[in-house]
């Protein structure tokens, strides 16, 4: 208001993004940049009725049994503690799987990110398969020991549309 009182024309005034749109009425001014709110991928409350958009779908490349003691992965190899049935998901971080936008860098934010990565899952039909180890560059290993699936079955996983590469974009 002081700027307008001094005789300056500002045009549309906006200095807020998605978080302010959802949580801070005073920061909205004349408009907001609601990029991540449109994707449902911003800090939000449980009752905001937004839906997260963006998922990838690919067929499983291979399914096989691996013996106890077998090593899986390259970046941080995991030694299997028991005979495990694994599936190869032909998607990795180069495709955007497991890639997230940096948020906070506090200890608790990083700890929360680490816990989420330990629990990352993929849907195969109506079943959930947990990722074994870390997401690879071009492939990711899944534990499908107790699941009914085979090579060629469609796997669906959460992916941020801003980082998705190597996929046909389809809006449903």
Residue ranges of each PLM-predicted region?
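Active-site anion/phosphate-binding pocket segments in diverse small-molecule metabolic enzymes
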Residues: 2-172
